């Protein structure tokens, strides 16, 4: 046996470690490779560039309300294809596909619970469900949220993320703009706070109704907020729009919104604002709250 064969016989080949799918993800803005569980702990905010990625409606509500206090409202409401609408695909098929993809029946999730011990009702849009579009069920659930806030004499918070009214429901979707706005008038009559949080994106009929009717209209950083999109506006007016047009930083500069709050700071700041509006003691930021246990980061990073 030659010397090289003797060396080769003592070499034990190693197996390549396999990384389960979904452990790592990439930031949409800076391209940084991120550990999925670490990103979830940071509320879907990139630790490198502070880009606020989209959150699911349930994750958003669970990150806002106190552990163990959440009760879902309006979950029995389901959309119906009353018009038998069809474009390139049947509406009922689009609904079935969206429900399978997201696990939600429609684009708005409503829950009541407590925020630092203070009773609140909160609603959040699921943008992955047909672009967070507003149909009759979204309108009905929002009104249910208002009614619950009135019954409990507590504030209402809504996190918007929507492309606007759902075209497959035609006038029934447009009617929700008036329906939700009329419901909010009852909150105003009672003197109960309604805080609207505009996330990326908040457009169309949602921005033209309840999303901009808050006692405070708060936005996340760099959120796209408006009625028509920038490209549509440019094609209509035949002019180039200024940089950052319709982003939350542009809107606060023009006085269209009241505040911009980073997502990791949202929970405490909302609680502080509502405590003042409701004449309640300020929340204790040191109050214990169970968090998500994040597993350790794997030693091996994914291959480029």
Swiss-Prot record:
SUPFAM superfamilies reported for this sequence: ClpP/crotonase
Pfam families the UniProt entry points to: Carboxyl_trans, Zn_ribbon_ACC
Subunit and partners: Acetyl-CoA carboxylase is a heterohexamer composed of biotin carboxyl carrier protein (AccB), biotin carboxylase (AccC) and two subunits each of ACCase subunit alpha (AccA) and ACCase subunit beta (AccD).
GO-annotated cellular components: acetate CoA-transferase complex
Tagged with keyword Lipid metabolism: yes
Keyword Metal-binding belongs to the record: yes
Naturally occurring in which organism (per UniProt): Escherichia coli O6:K15:H31 (strain 536 / UPEC)
EC number(s) from the headed UniProt entry: 2.1.3.15
Cofactor binding note: Binds 1 zinc ion per subunit.
CC cofactor: Zn(2+)
Full protein name: Acetyl-coenzyme A carboxylase carboxyl transferase subunit beta
Region (Disordered): 284-304
CoA carboxyltransferase N-terminal domain boundaries: 23-292
Entry's Gene Ontology BP terms: fatty acid biosynthetic process; malonyl-CoA biosynthetic process
Catalytic activity: N(6)-carboxybiotinyl-L-lysyl-[protein] + acetyl-CoA = N(6)-biotinyl-L-lysyl-[protein] + malonyl-CoA
């Amino acid at each position: 046996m030659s010397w090289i064969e003797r060396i080769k016989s003592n070499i034990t080949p190693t197996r390549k470690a396999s990384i389960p799918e979904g452990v790592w993800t990439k930031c949409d803005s800076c391209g940084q490779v991120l550990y999925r569980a670490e990103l979830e702990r940071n509320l879907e905010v990139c630790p490198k560039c502070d880009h606020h990625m989209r959150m699911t409606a349930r994750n958003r509500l669970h990150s806002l309300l106190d552990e163990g206090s959440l009760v879902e409202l309006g979950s029995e409401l389901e959309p119906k294809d009353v018009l038998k609408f069809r474009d390139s695909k049947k509406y009922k098929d689009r609904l079935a596909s969206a429900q399978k993809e997201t696990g939600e029946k429609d684009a708005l999730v409503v829950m009541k619970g407590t925020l630092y011990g203070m009773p609140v009702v909160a609603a959040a849009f699921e943008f992955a469900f047909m672009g967070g579009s507003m149909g009759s069920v979204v309108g009905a659930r929002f009104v249910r949220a208002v009614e619950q806030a009135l019954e409990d004499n507590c504030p209402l918070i809504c996190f918007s993320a929507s492309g606007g009214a759902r075209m497959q429901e035609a006038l029934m979707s447009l009617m929700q703009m008036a329906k939700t706005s009329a419901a909010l008038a009852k909150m105003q009559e009672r003197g109960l706070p309604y805080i609207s949080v505009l996330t990326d994106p908040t457009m169309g009929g949602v921005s033209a109704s309840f999303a901009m009717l808050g006692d405070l209209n708060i936005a996340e950083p760099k959120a796209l907020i408006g009625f028509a999109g920038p490209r549509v506006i440019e094609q209509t007016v035949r002019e180039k729009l200024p940089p950052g047009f319709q982003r939350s930083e542009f809107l606060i500069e023009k006085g269209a919104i009241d505040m911009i709050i980073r997502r990791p700071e949202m929970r405490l700041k909302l609680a502080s604002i509502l405590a003042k509006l409701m004449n309640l003691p300020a929340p204790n930021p040191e109050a214990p709250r169970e968090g998500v246990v994040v597993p350790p980061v794997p030693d091996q990073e994914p291959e480029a």
